[in-house]
């Protein structure tokens, strides 16, 4: 594990690194959804719990395999968090979620694990529920965004067409759009937002 990876495993360091981009990342979710209608949220790979602030008036459960992140999240946000593997997590039908968020995680795992994870998340959705995925798109070579992508901890950034193929194979697309993350007037990362319901 590199020094950067070791540092970002620390909840405080990770939270500070993400802080400038939290609002930008989440903006498409707010633009396309009436958050007052959300009932029960599952925040997959929730990290140190930053997303929980978006769901203060809903039922919320954050799940992450990193126990240090979960301990930090419980202490800081006083919401429900569990250390578990979302690929195998199960709930009773009455405890399913109408809003499942996967924010900036899938580019950390290979395609087999992405499919396994998303396949399981389908079983955790209510009949009217949707999955909401925010993730990095592999930028064109030679750009600042590509340099930052190559330096990222996640080694599985994918072109947009690959994301489309994965998502549409498991969910009915409702929204799929790309957007930039910017800083100092520059496009630093390219992102995709996908909203989908489970295929019947």
Label each region the model flagged.
Residues 1-91, 109-116, 120, 130-200:
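Class I (Rossmann-like) S-adenosyl-L-methionine-dependent methyltransferase catalytic domain
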């Amino acid at each position: 594990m590199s020094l950067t990876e070791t540092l970002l495993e620390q909840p405080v360091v990770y939270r500070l690194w993400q802080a400038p981009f939290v609002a930008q990342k989440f903006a498409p979710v707010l633009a396309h959804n009436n958050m007052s209608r959300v009932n029960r949220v599952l925040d997959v790979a929730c990290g140190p719990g930053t997303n929980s602030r978006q769901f203060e008036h809903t039922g919320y459960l954050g799940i992450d395999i990193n126990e240090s992140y979960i301990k930090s999240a419980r202490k800081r946000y006083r919401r429900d968090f569990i250390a578990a593997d979302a690929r195998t997590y199960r709930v009773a039908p009455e405890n399913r979620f109408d809003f499942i968020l996967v924010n900036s995680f899938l580019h950390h795992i290979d395609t087999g694990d992405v499919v396994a994870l998303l396949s399981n998340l389908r079983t955790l959705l209510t009949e009217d529920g949707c999955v909401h995925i925010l993730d990095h798109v592999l930028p064109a070579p030679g750009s600042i965004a590509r340099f930052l992508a190559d330096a990222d901890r996640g080694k599985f950034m994918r072109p947009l067409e690959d994301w489309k193929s994965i998502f549409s194979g498991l969910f009915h697309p409702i929204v799929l759009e790309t957007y930039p993350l910017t800083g100092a007037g520059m496009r630093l990362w390219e992102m995709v937002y996908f909203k989908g319901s489970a295929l019947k």
